[in-house]
Amino acid sequence: MARNTLSSRFRRVDIDEFDENKFVDEHEEAAAASGEPGPDPCEVDGLLRQGDMLRAFHAALRNSPINTKNQAVKERAQGIVLKVLTNFKSSEIEQAVQSLDRNGIDLLMKYIYKGFEKPTENSSAVLLQWHEKALAVGGLGSIIRVLTARKTV
């Protein structure tokens, strides 16, 4: 009995290894290794410089990080989409919204409402124009689907 209590095997465990401040989620590591979800900022910036707003709009909405829990990826995607939305001319907004299907309009509405949460200079006026056109095409159902959706952008 005395022999078991004097054992020092328990001292070989490095308790700093189990520090909760050093926690790393395996899913985030796998996502970072396989390429993060979200729009490609280089592709979107290139299309914006070329003046191809419609393709930049579709590229920004492609691969949206809805299923990820990484908030930094979601913020980066929100910034890219907001940059594209603010670069559109007022006369081109309706054509861009009409080029989307129902799921695309719902995704656009999610980004619009996310933009309303954290307004930047002049973004609210632009987002209101986008909201008006998206509401005309998607109807009230798109607002309800966005507000009741569990997966956010």
From Swiss-Prot:
Entry GO CC: Arp2/3 protein complex; cytoplasm; glutamatergic synapse; synapse
Origin species: Rattus norvegicus (Rat)
Alphabetized SUPFAM superfamilies for the sequence: Arp2/3 complex 16 kDa subunit ARPC5 (SSF69103)
Domain of life: Eukaryota
GO BP terms: Arp2/3 complex-mediated actin nucleation; cell migration; regulation of actin filament polymerization
Localization annotation: Cytoplasm, Cytoskeleton
Name used for this protein in its record: Actin-related protein 2/3 complex subunit 5-like protein
PTM annotation (Phosphoserine): residues: 64
InterPro entries for the chain: ARPC5, ARPC5_sf
Main location: cytoplasm
Function field: May function as component of the Arp2/3 complex which is involved in regulation of actin polymerization and together with an activating nucleation-promoting factor (NPF) mediates the formation of branched actin networks.
